[in-house]
Design a protein with these regions (language model features):
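Domain-level signal for soluble alpha/beta catalytic cores
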Residues: 1-356
């Protein structure tokens, strides 16, 4: 059983360690983030996304690749070299495994594309004319084609970054899809997601590839869509998307699971709930505890540094307890009255189990 971050950290207090706005400042921030993760017992460790909190720089660099369909090499090479350089710096600061998180192609493909108008918006704009409605439908089809092209181009650009990280020795690469909850039952969207992730992952050798579903529940897309590509593990946010438990239950037992259960909010989940989530995930598909980890439910960038450190400590402590055999220490750490069947059934204490 292990614990890891599935999102970013707030900026640690730096003091006079480095001048603001310099490369030295970013290096110092990353080191402080790594030391805090080590102290909390987390592994694999991340750079806390302190260099590129929302993947904005990486998205811009890869946008050059996706811009006109010709996949120019300059933006892709820069994305690869800067990402590898950042991972190598973080990995050189600790003897623990360091993973690299990347944005997913489906989410990137939605950037900069206007969302379809609602029916009421169309009615107001088009005043009910048949020709106007047909024009809007054509625009939506063109928008969908453009987004599909961009998504696949982003998948190609990300594939280059993944291969560069693999060549550098990165042991674990996490692909985060924030918009997978928007797929639903749309067959075209499901196909686009599957095609993009196959383009990104098939034939990659070396690192452990993990798909992270954040921002909501992607269960509506179906396990056949989310689990189609050959990822070695699946991470899910169970606070923003409790129905992601259905994906956990349908994930084959030879794949790992990271359950995101410690959210970036004021109230902490009881330790007993975290242990319940870890052991339930371990029970699905005959998976066992060695293929299960506890994770943050999203990131902690919205918190104070002190609060984020407390959340990481909670994660690390829960993973340590979840790995324990029955013992006096474990018994002392748990409150048997913290979960009632009635409260759990109402969803007050535990993440909802999967529907059958």
């Amino acid at each position: 059983m292990f614990a890891t971050l599935l999102g970013g950290l707030p900026r640690p207090p730096l003091g006079d360690a480095a001048r603001a706005g310099t490369a030295g400042e970013l290096d110092a921030l990353v080191e402080l983030g790594i030391r805090a993760q080590e102290a909390a017992g987390l592994e694999p460790i991340t750079d806390g996304r302190l260099r590129d909190p929302a993947f904005e720089w990486l998205a811009a660099a890869l946008g050059a690749v996706a811009g006109d369909g010709s996949a120019p090499s300059s933006g892709g090479r820069r994305a690869e070299s800067i990402t590898v350089e950042g991972w190598r710096f973080a990995a050189g600061l600790t003897d623990r495994a360091v993973k690299q998180a990347l944005p997913g192609p489906y989410t990137l493909g939605r950037l900069g594309i206007d969302p379809p108008k609602s029916v009421s918006e169309k009615a107001r704009l088009l005043m009910g004319t048949a020709k106007g409605l047909e024009r809007e439908r054509r625009r939506e089809r063109e928008r969908a084609r453009e987004r599909g092209r961009r998504t696949m181009a982003f998948a190609d650009g990300l594939r280059g970054v993944v291969e560069a990280l693999a060549a550098a020795g990165c042991p674990l690469i996490e692909i985060e899809e924030l918009d997978a909850h928007l797929i639903g039952d749309d067959e075209a969207e499901r196909r686009l997601f599957r095609d993009a992730h196959r383009r990104l992952t098939e034939g990659v050798e070396g690192p452990h590839l993990s798909l992270s579903i954040a921002g909501g529940s992607a269960a509506g897309a179906g396990a056949a869509t989310i689990l189609d590509a050959p990822y070695a593990s699946l991470a899910v946010d169970l606070i923003a998307g409790p129905d992601n438990w259905n994906l956990v239950a349908e994930t084959p037992g030879d794949r790992g699971i990271v359950v995101g259960v410690v959210a970036g909010r004021e109230r902490d989940e009881p330790t007993e709930i975290l242990l319940w989530a870890a052991h339930y995930a371990a029970s699905t598909g005959g998976r066992g505890p060695t293929r299960v980890g506890l994770g943050s439910a999203g990131g902690y960038a919205n918190l104070t540094w002190e609060a984020a450190v407390g959340k990481m400590q909670l994660l690390g402590d829960a993973a340590r307890l979840a790995a324990m055999p029955p013992s006096e220490e474990l018994a002392r750490s748990l409150d048997p009255a913290s979960i009632s069947a009635r409260r759990a059934a109402l969803g007050h204490d535990a993440p909802r189990p999967p529907r059958r």
